[in-house]
Amino acid sequence: MSKFFERDDDIVALATPFLSSALCVIRSSGASSISKFSKIFSNHSALNSASGNTIHYGYILDSENGCKVDEVVVCLYRAPKSFTGQDAIEVMAHGSVIGIKKIIDLFLKSGFRMAEPGEFTLRAFLAKKIDLTKAEAIHEIIFAKTNKTYSLAVNKLSGALFVKIDAIKKSILNFLSAVSVYLDYEVDDHEISIPFDLILSSKAELKKLINSYKVYEKIDNGVALVLAGSVNAGKSSLFNLFLKKDRSIVSSYPGTTRDYIEASFELDGILFNLFDTAGLRDADNFVERLGIEKSNSLIKEASLVIYVIDVSSNLTKDDFLFIDSNKSNSKILFVLNKIDLKINKSTEEFVRSKVLNSSNLIMISTKNLEGIDILYDKIRALISYERVEIGLDDIIISSNRQMQLLEKAYALILDLLSKIDRQVSYDMLAFDAYEIINCLGEITGEVSSEDVLDNMFKNFCLGK
């Protein structure tokens, strides 16, 4: 058994980022964690005799010379009433990088070892404080990209997914119990009712969960939105406007963006992966040509393209080519920018004459924000097919591990239904039902292997 699964030793890790900040949290867990920590805490006698769920003020002391290292607040937990189910100490110290190093070094000198990524959550699972669906929900909460995915993860943390999987499992178990009675007591078919309807209802519930994974992928992956156009048309200004901060360099010099810049923003619960591309033009050198080739590739792969045109200037050769080639492309929104300047009528008239869908043409100014609200409304309309209406109480599958097990369980149910139709022996039905129950048990962690747990928890961040 690997060190990852040993629970007899005492572990420590920084639970907050290793950066300068107002505060940091250093957490520890283990049977001897309180007594070991008390050796480096100024109020050690009070700590050793304290009850669980208590807070203590004092100083971390250097174990060699007794000097004060930092002023801290200590949260003390006693088994089994802690996250890990073990005695545990959480130290809130000042967020000094130097101080953090000193404190953790003192922990290590006192007999602790550095925790592996995810080891605290693993100990919570092994102590049956949480199931695997809750463990994965913790990971999803930490790495949520949008408000929607965060809320869905919180719902799973409350146990909603476990309850759903457990209900399906109980239905299969009821079916298995009825079949087992038939096999064990050799009763006739008419003497016992086999609840075949439970298999059909379980199939429907599994299908809903499987479909929910596709919904989650759409929410989590986001919509690829590419800003394209000739040099100095205002793409970078629009990029910064979407982000509500400066990420792209904005200047009056044409061609400031040589490759592309990527960032994300959220609109109405939908994640947008935004790309500010190099201006389309005849490149003078190899590096610029590579950037423009990448821009063209991004345009082809995007869910939505905003082609920005400087309406105060003449159209470029690349503008003419792009407009003519994409005038009927429904995923491209043509934006005439710089309407705060004197409008070039020939540019405006040409674009209006070519773009077949006039609603796909918007006039804006990134300088005074005129037309920006109309642009947002048009983006909402164009990506309405990406919009997924999900209630915060809906149960969504977001883990590839869970998805694979659900698909396996679903395939087993289809096989079981086929055998029921063919009226195969009941012992074969019982075997398939047992396999489905085991498969569902793997989702919640009631059935699990060390290799699966090792791989899953090591994807967690350190200190969690």
Swiss-Prot record:
Keyword ATP-binding: no
Location in or out of the cell: Cytoplasm
Alphabetical list of Gene3D superfamilies matching this protein: P-loop containing nucleotide triphosphate hydrolases, Probable tRNA modification gtpase trme, domain 1, tRNA modification GTPase MnmE domain 2
UniProt cofactor(s): K(+)
Domain of life: Bacteria
GO biological process: tRNA methylation; tRNA wobble uridine modification
The UniProt record lists the keyword Methyltransferase: no
MF terms in GO: GTP binding; GTPase activity; metal ion binding
Binding sites annotated in the UniProt record for GTP: 232-237, 251-257, 276-279
Subcellular location, principal: cytoplasm
Keywords, in A-Z order: Cytoplasm, GTP-binding, Hydrolase, Magnesium, Metal-binding, Nucleotide-binding, Potassium, tRNA processing
Residues the record lists as binding (6S)-5-formyl-5,6,7,8-tetrahydrofolate: R27, E90, K129, K464
A GO cellular-component term linked to this record: cytosol
Entry binding sites for K(+): S251
A Pfam short name: MMR_HSR1
Cofactor binding note of this UniProt entry: Binds 1 potassium ion per subunit.
PROSITE patterns cross-referenced by the UniProt entry: G_TRME
Record domain TrmE-type G: where: 222-384
Stated role: Exhibits a very high intrinsic GTPase hydrolysis rate. Involved in the addition of a carboxymethylaminomethyl (cmnm) group at the wobble position (U34) of certain tRNAs, forming tRNA-cmnm(5)s(2)U34.
Subunit description: Homodimer. Heterotetramer of two MnmE and two MnmG subunits.
Family affiliation: Belongs to the TRAFAC class TrmE-Era-EngA-EngB-Septin-like GTPase superfamily. TrmE GTPase family.
Designated name of the protein: tRNA modification GTPase MnmE
Lineage: Bacteria, Pseudomonadati, Spirochaetota, Spirochaetia, Spirochaetales
Protein's gene: mnmE
